[in-house]
């Protein structure tokens, strides 16, 4: 990617993200963090709150840190979300080895164009964003730094320290991300040891960082409650209990790992097969193509046996990678495919699981598919630009009315509280299916007279609401 193209891509993406993140309203647990943020007046207050949550209910230290400091600080929240998403696009492209403007734009569109259920729990919802986007960003950044170190066969102390810090910090968010990072760090350490006949200091430092971060996360006393009936997240005791949980979770697991994600479910086979079409096909080429196409048809049109269809899809994907790619692209694609499975596997044994938990797997599958991208022609670049513009316009058509309703709500609350009203009527959000927990009583965490809950919020249809 030429410097001028790179600058245009980044500035365009930054502008689009800035507009959308400004339009996204607070929803669900964001209101709790909004009220909490107003009560944090010093670093000591913040540290005490983080330690208290680590000991009791929520050990995700860095996820909580970002969510708490952005509570009641809309400009900071807007800047953080815009910058972190832009960095995610940038380092995802770097990890995938993408150097063209069209490739960058296509990957950015893929990362943003999530299935609706995942999208509304990741981008519009601040609490979800700060727990799920940063760890993926940190992992991809670490992968890029580590790949450079292995290529140069040098492990300067600053680079090793950076990898140690990235490995440690990336673990202080979501649990399945943490497990995936530990497995990835261990694999890379062993692989470089076998390949180079000696351990790589860079890989060892990253692995050590992931172990230390995971130790801090999982030694939280809050995890002692996962077998209790009233815990927010639960894990059955014993092997039989775990297997029963895995069986119950299997439909959700297969749906949000692959079957319910058309961008990766269809995109990977399309890119892989198109990359091979110009060459002479052999019998061995037909096998992965048949597995990929057959499993896609199965997932789309056959309601039963979805788990088996997903299994065949991954078999076809690995077959395509090892048959149709070579060198660094093959290694990257296989690593990303395995990473997607490793990130999803722990979710089989915990309840409840939400679509947002599969964000890291979704991104890794996109990066695997990106290894099949051909060098773009001009017409392809224009098509990708038109696609990105269309998705941006669609988002505006959904979230601009939501933004206007959020402003109406805020004005109505301000007027009602000035009059001392104990019950406040508010209009429902339009397009509420694109928001997480949109019309919620959790507003009372941010709006109250003396104690949270002394105001009741009543939601009414837009046509029945009047100021």
Which positions does each model-derived feature cover?
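Alpha-helical transmembrane segments
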Residues: 5-19, 103-110, 162-167, 205-212, ...
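Transmembrane alpha-helical segments
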Residues: 84-95, 138-150, 182-190, 265-270, ...
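Signature aromatic-anchored transmembrane alpha helix within multi-pass, membrane-resident enzymes
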Residues: 159, 284-293, 325-341, 373-395
């Amino acid at each position: 990617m030429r410097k001028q193209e790179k600058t245009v891509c980044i500035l365009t993406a930054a502008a689009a993200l800035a507009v959308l993140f400004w339009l996204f309203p607070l929803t669900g647990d964001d209101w709790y963090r909004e009220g909490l943020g107003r009560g944090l007046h010093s670093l000591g207050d913040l540290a005490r709150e983080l330690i208290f949550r680590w000991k009791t209910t929520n050990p995700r230290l860095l996820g909580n840190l970002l969510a708490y400091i952005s509570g009641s600080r809309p400009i900071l929240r807007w800047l953080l979300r815009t910058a972190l998403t832009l960095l995610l696009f940038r380092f995802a492209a770097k990890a995938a080895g993408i150097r063209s403007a069209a490739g960058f734009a296509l990957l950015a569109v893929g990362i943003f164009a999530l299935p609706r259920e995942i999208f509304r729990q990741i981008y519009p919802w601040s609490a979800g964003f700060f727990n799920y986007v940063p760890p993926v960003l940190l992992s991809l950044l670490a992968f890029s730094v580590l790949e450079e170190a292995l290529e140069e066969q040098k492990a300067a102390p600053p680079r090793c320290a950076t990898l140690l810090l990235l490995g440690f910090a990336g673990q202080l968010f979501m649990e399945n991300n943490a497990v995936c990072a530990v497995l990835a760090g261990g694999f890379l350490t062993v692989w470089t040891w076998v390949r180079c006949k000696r351990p790589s200091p860079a890989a060892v430092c990253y692995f050590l960082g992931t172990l230390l971060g995971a130790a801090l996360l999982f030694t939280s006393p809050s995890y002692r409650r996962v077998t209790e009936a009233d815990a927010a997240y639960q894990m059955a005791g014993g092997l039989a209990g775990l297997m029963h949980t895995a069986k119950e979770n299997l439909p959700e697991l297969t749906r949000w790992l692959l079957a319910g994600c058309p961008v990766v479910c269809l995109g990977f086979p399309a890119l892989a097969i198109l990359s091979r079409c110009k060459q002479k096909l052999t019998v061995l080429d037909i096998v992965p193509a048949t597995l990929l196409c057959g499993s896609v048809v199965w997932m789309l049109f056959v309601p039963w046996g979805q788990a088996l269809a997903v299994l065949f899809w991954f078999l076809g994907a690995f077959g395509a990678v090892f048959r149709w790619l070579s060198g660094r692209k093959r290694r990257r694609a296989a690593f990303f495919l395995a990473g997607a499975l490793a990130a999803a596997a722990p979710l089989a044994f915990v309840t409840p699981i939400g679509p947002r938990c599969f964000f890291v797997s979704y991104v890794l599958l996109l990066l695997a598919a990106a290894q099949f991208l051909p060098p773009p022609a001009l017409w392809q670049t224009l098509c990708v630009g038109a696609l990105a513009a269309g998705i941006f316009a669609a988002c505006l058509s959904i979230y601009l009315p939501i933004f206007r309703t959020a402003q109406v709500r805020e004005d109505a609350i301000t007027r009602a509280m000035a009059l001392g009203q104990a019950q406040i009527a508010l209009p429902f959000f339009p397009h509420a299916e694109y928001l997480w927990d949109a019309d919620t009583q959790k507003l009372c965490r941010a709006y109250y007279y003396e104690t949270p809950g002394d105001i009741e919020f009543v939601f009414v249809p837009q046509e029945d609401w009047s100021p």
